[in-house]
């Protein structure tokens, strides 16, 4: 690494430490020429797959767009930003884990719905109504009935739903 003070090409590492929950390495360096010290941070560059839209266009994965979708669906719902960020991180991890260079936007939409189903059932129905383009009340009823059946079959989901109702409102 070049010294930021004298531009010499030779520096030595004095100290290395893991930071940011082990996702970065902090290195203290010293220039061999001018003896100045400086700090660098090293992190893995994780490339997200490109998104293939329904019309066939391709665009880079946009984490902000993903987060905005969650925020819109969860507006005025009792879900913390930490839970939203964790859901975004889980989706990014699963998308990278596919190993694909490109993914259909439908895959991302289904991942969002899966996370919302666990976070907040009202937000799930809200998102699904837009994502799946519900046309009438029957489609809402069908989705809510499916959620009710799934919740009855899965005690964990029922417990999460009942805990959300215990949150005090203003």
UniProtKB/Swiss-Prot annotation:
Protein name, entry field: Transcriptional repressor NrdR
GO BP term (any one): negative regulation of DNA-templated transcription
GO molecular function, one term: ATP binding
Listed Pfam families: ATP-cone, Zn_ribbon_NrdR
Domain ATP-cone: 49-139
Region (Disordered): 150-170
Composition bias type Basic and acidic residues, residue spans: 161-170
Residue intervals of every unnamed zinc finger in the record: 3-34
Cofactor or coenzyme needed: Zn(2+)
Record InterPro entries: ATP-cone_dom, NrdR-like_N, RNR_NrdR-like
Main function: Negatively regulates transcription of bacterial ribonucleotide reductase nrd genes and operons by binding to NrdR-boxes.
Keywords: ATP-binding, DNA-binding, Metal-binding, Nucleotide-binding, Repressor, Transcription, Transcription regulation, Zinc, Zinc-finger
This protein's record includes keyword Repressor: yes
Family: Belongs to the NrdR family.
Keyword Endoplasmic reticulum among UniProt keywords: no
Cofactor note: Binds 1 zinc ion.
Lineage of producing organism: Bacteria, Pseudomonadati, Pseudomonadota, Gammaproteobacteria, Oceanospirillales
Highest taxon in the source lineage: Bacteria
């Amino acid at each position: 690494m070049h010294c930021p003070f004298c531009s010499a090409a030779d520096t030595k590492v004095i100290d290395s430490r893991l930071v940011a929950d082990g996702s970065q390495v902090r290195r203290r360096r010293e220039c061999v020429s001018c003896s100045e010290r400086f700090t660098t941070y090293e992190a893995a560059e994780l490339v997200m797959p490109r998104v293939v839209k329904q019309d066939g266009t391709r665009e880079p994965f946009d984490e902000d767009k993903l987060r905005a979708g969650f925020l819109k669906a969860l507006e005025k719902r009792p879900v913390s930003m930490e839970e939203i960020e964790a859901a975004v991180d889980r989706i990014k991890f699963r998308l990278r884990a596919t190993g694909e260079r490109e993914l259909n936007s439908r895959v991302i939409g289904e991942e969002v719905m899966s996370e919302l189903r666990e976070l907040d059932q009202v937000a799930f129905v809200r998102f699904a109504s837009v994502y799946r383009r519900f046309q009438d009340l029957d489609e809402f009823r069908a989705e809510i009935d499916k959620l009710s059946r799934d919740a009855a079959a899965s005690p964990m989901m029922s417990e999460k739903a009942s805990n959300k109702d215990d949150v005090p409102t203003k």
